[in-house]
Amino acid sequence: MFLYEYKMERGIAMDSRVESYFEDIKGKKIAFLGIGGSNLPLAKIFRQKGAIVFACDKREKEQLGKTGEELEQMGITLKLGEHYLEQLDVDMMFRTPGMRFHTKELEQAREKGIVVTSEMEVFFDLCPCPIYAVTGSDGKTTTTTIISEFLKAAGKRIHLGG
């Protein structure tokens, strides 16, 4: 569950950076590239916050099942099929984590001044607390658990995620 959804469900006031961010995206054209698990909830939130949202995916509508219809009912425009990355007239693009950072289409978008970002990048920008990250092939869970226990023992309030 996204931090935004969690706080809204519980009536918790949002950090002013988050409020300002959502205010800034009103009326902006934002494309979500890849509409699987990660970008889908974010696209819905951005639409609710007044952005003009495009859900872009190399799959065809039939392959999306109910998801395509649900997005269209929310007022989200679908751009689907083999050429889904071509001629996107948008202000910002959110690429899915599985998408390579340096594709021809993304480089062309950057050259046009389009912001190419990801949900994690925006989270890191807006998160009001320090973030510690552990990467690698093996041992991440163990290492993360040990670090979190050290921080707890030092009296720090932590939120562990992965």
Regions found by a protein language model. Give the residues of each.
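Residues at the starts of beta-strands that form the adenosine-phosphate
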Residues: K29, A51-I52, R157
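Glycine-rich adenosine-cofactor-binding loop
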Residues: K29-P41
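A short, basic/flexible loop-to-alpha-helix module at the beginning of a structural domain
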Residues: M14-I25, H83, V122-F124
